[in-house]
Curated annotation (Swiss-Prot):
Protein name per its UniProtKB record: Protein TIFY 4A
Organism: Arabidopsis thaliana (Mouse-ear cress)
PROSITE patterns: TIFY
Bias (Basic residues): 243-256
Annotated Tify domain residues: 150-185
Length: 313
C-alpha cells in the first residue's frame, strides 16, 4: 500500500511551480480529497477536475508569493476579481513638482491603448503645446499653466466602445463622472429630450394595436351575427315557398283524378259495341254447342269483360 501511495505524496509535496502536466495527470480523485482533508477542508469536491483545481489553489495559498505562477495564483485567489469598467478615467495627482514649478507628471502606461505624445493635448492644454520626453521614458512634461487652470485637475479618459478604443485628453473629473453616469443609464434620457425612447414608441404602438384588435373583433362578431340572422330569414322564406309548392302539387293532383275517371268510362263505352260484334261472330263460327247456351250466360259475358276492364283501369 505504501508503494502505491508514495508517488501521489511525492507529487503533492512538490511546489506548485515545479508541477508538470504529467504530474497532475497522475493524480487521482482520492489522492486530492485526502490531501485537501489533511489541510483542513471539510467537503472537498467529488469531481476529479474540481478536486485538482482545489489542490492547486490551496498550494498557491500556502506557498509564499513570488513572480512565478504560484504568486499569480495567490493574487487571483486572495484579491477580489475586478471587472474592468467600460469607461475608465485616469486622473493626475498633484506632486511636489507641481507646487514648485507648475509641472504635471503623467505615470507611464505600458498598455496598447495609451498614446504617448498625443497632439490633442495641445488643444486642451491652453499652453504652447510643447512636450519633452525624457530618456528613461517614465515621465512626460507639459508646459506650465496658469494658477486658475492648475487649480482644477484635468486627466485623460479612455473609452472602450464596440471594439474600438477612444482616448481623450484634458477631461475634468466632473465631466468624466457625467459621462460615466450617462453610459451606465443609456435608456434614461433628459425630460426635454429631442427624441423619444424606443421603449415609449413601442409602448404607444402596442397600445394602438391593442385598441384596434378589440374593434376588429367586435366588427367580425357583428358581421357574423348579421349573416346568421340573414341566413335564418332566408331559410324560413325557402321553407315557406317549399310548403306552398307542395300544397299546389297536391291540389293539382286532386283536380286531375276526376278527368282520368271520365276518360276511362268513355273508352269503355266506345269499346262495348265492338266487343258485342266480336262476340256475335264467335257464336256464328262455333255452331250448336254455343247456341245451346242460355241467355243468362250470354248476358254474363259482357259483365265479365266490364269487370276486367275496370280492374285494368
Amino acid at each position: 500500500m505504501d508503494v502505491g501511495v508514495s508517488p501521489a505524496k511525492s507529487i503533492l509535496a512538490k511546489p506548485l511551480k515545479l508541477l508538470t502536466e504529467e504530474d497532475i495527470s497522475q493524480l487521482t480523485r482520492e489522492d486530492c480529497r485526502k490531501f485537501l482533508k489533511d489541510k483542513g477542508m471539510r467537503r472537498p469536491s467529488w469531481n476529479k477536475s474540481q478536486a485538482i483545481q482545489q489542490v492547486l489553489s490551496l498550494k498557491a495559498l500556502y506557498e509564499p508569493g513570488d513572480d512565478s505562477g504560484a504568486g499569480i495564483f495567490r493574487k487571483i485567489l486572495v484579491s477580489q476579481p475586478v471587472n474592468p469598467p467600460r469607461v475608465t478615467t485616469t486622473l493626475i495627482e498633484p506632486s511636489n513638482e507641481l507646487e514648485a514649478c507648475g509641472r504635471v507628471s503623467y505615470p507611464e502606461d505600458n498598455g496598447a491603448c495609451h498614446r504617448m505624445d498625443s497632439p490633442r493635448s495641445a488643444e486642451f492644454s491652453g499652453g504652447s503645446g510643447h512636450f519633452v520626453s525624457e530618456k528613461d521614458g517614465h515621465k512626460t512634461t507639459i508646459s506650465p499653466r496658469s494658477p486658475a487652470e492648475t487649480s482644477e485637475l484635468v486627466g485623460q479618459m479612455t473609452i472602450f466602445y464596440s471594439g474600438k478604443v477612444n482616448v481623450y485628453d484634458g477631461i475634468p473629473p466632473e465631466k468624466a463622472r457625467s459621462i460615466m453616469h450617462f453610459a451606465a443609464n443609456p435608456i434614461d434620457l433628459p425630460e426635454n429630450g429631442i427624441f423619444a425612447s424606443s421603449r415609449m414608441i413601442s409602448k404607444l404602438i402596442s397600445k394602438e394595436k391593442m385598441m384596434e384588435l378589440p374593434q376588429k373583433g367586435l366588427e367580425k362578431a357583428n358581421s357574423s351575427r348579421d349573416s346568421g340572422m340573414e341566413g335564418q330569414a332566408n331559410r324560413k322564406v325557402s321553407l315557406q315557398r317549399y310548403r306552398e309548392k307542395r300544397k299546389d302539387r297536391k291540389f293539382s293532383k286532386a283536380k286531375k283524378c276526376p278527368g282520368v275517371a271520365s276518360s276511362s268510362l268513355e273508352m269503355f263505352l266506345n269499346c262495348q259495341p265492338r266487343m258485342k260484334a266480336a262476340y256475335s261472330q264467335n257464336l256464328g263460327c262455333t255452331g250448336s254447342p254455343l247456341h245451346s247456351q242460355s241467355p243468362e250466360s250470354q248476358t254474363k259475358s259482357p259483365n265479365l269483360s266490364v269487370d276486367l276492364n275496370s280492374e285494368g283501369i
